[in-house]
């Protein structure tokens, strides 16, 4: 409806989030969770209390061997959070769980994503059968964690959690689009699903300026043009914004 909030961008502990009003079709799952590294126990208890309120406890907040004080919960909106004591300032790091058909493919995914986006692997903890119990990596300077889970789970990746990066021009958008949708799937409005089922988006500063312009009529034209396409075409959206298409 006109006047309803569609998107909002916020920063939590140095991690940028873009929230979308996507409707009931977008249901989050623990396949992607967010690891909150807290500065001290007081902060940890407060964060846990807020996130766990009216939520679903997956692992109670307590002391675990090798993990220390740790808890895992789905908040009241269904988003999944791992809360633990960190060593420095509070941080939030996305965590990707590879289970079921993806079990054992975490290292391959890291290698592919680094080849596409640029980055590096930061740590490796091996588990059973030489799988990745946990591994840290960076994509374009952003920290992520991935783990192979041997357990059978009923959940998988959904569009409720996706990763997005800003790209400066159409050439970069095209390269990433072709790489991620190869053996994957194309979705409307610049969304991509890779061959592991993880969802990605390509964003551009100009695109955001057009679709969020204070000139509501121009913004509407740009947004409607974007809704018509799968891969983002900056030139076509700009023409719609300028009224020249």
Locate the predicted segments by residue.
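Short, small/polar residue-rich loop motifs at catalytic or cofactor-binding pockets
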Residues: 4, 65-68, 130-131, 185-187
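Terminal peptide-recognition signature
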Residues: 10, 51, 75, 94, ...
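Active-site region of chymotrypsin-like
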Residues: 53-62, 89-90, 171-179, 183-186
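Short, glycine-anchored, charge-dense loop/turn motifs used at functional sites
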Residues: 74-81, 193-203
């Amino acid at each position: 409806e006109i006047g309803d909030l569609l998107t909002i961008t916020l920063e939590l502990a140095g991690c940028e989030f873009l929230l979308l009003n996507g409707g009931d079709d977008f249901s989050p799952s623990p396949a992607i969770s967010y690891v909150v590294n807290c500065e001290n126990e007081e902060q940890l208890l407060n964060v846990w209390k807020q996130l766990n309120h009216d939520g679903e406890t997956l692992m109670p907040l307590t002391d675990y061997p090798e993990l220390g004080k740790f808890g895992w919960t789905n908040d009241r909106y269904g988003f999944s959070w791992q809360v633990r004591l960190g060593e420095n300032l509070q941080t939030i790091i996305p965590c990707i769980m590879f289970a079921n058909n993806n079990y054992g493919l975490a290292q391959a995914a890291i290698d592919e994503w680094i080849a596409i986006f640029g980055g590096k692997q930061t740590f490796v903890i091996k588990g059973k059968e030489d799988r990745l119990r946990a591994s840290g990596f960076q994509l374009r300077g952003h920290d992520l964690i991935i783990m192979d889970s041997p357990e059978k789970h009923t959940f998988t990746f959904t569009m409720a959690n996706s990763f997005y990066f800003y790209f400066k021009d159409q050439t970069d958008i095209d390269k990433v689009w072709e790489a991620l949708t190869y053996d994957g799937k194309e979705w409307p409005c610049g969304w991509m699903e890779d061959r592991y089922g993880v969802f990605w988006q390509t964003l551009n500063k100009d695109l955001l300026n057009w679709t969020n312009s204070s000139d509501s009529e121009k913004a509407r034209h740009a947004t409607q043009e974007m809704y018509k396409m799968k891969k983002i075409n900056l030139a076509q959206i700009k023409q719609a914004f300028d009224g020249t298409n």
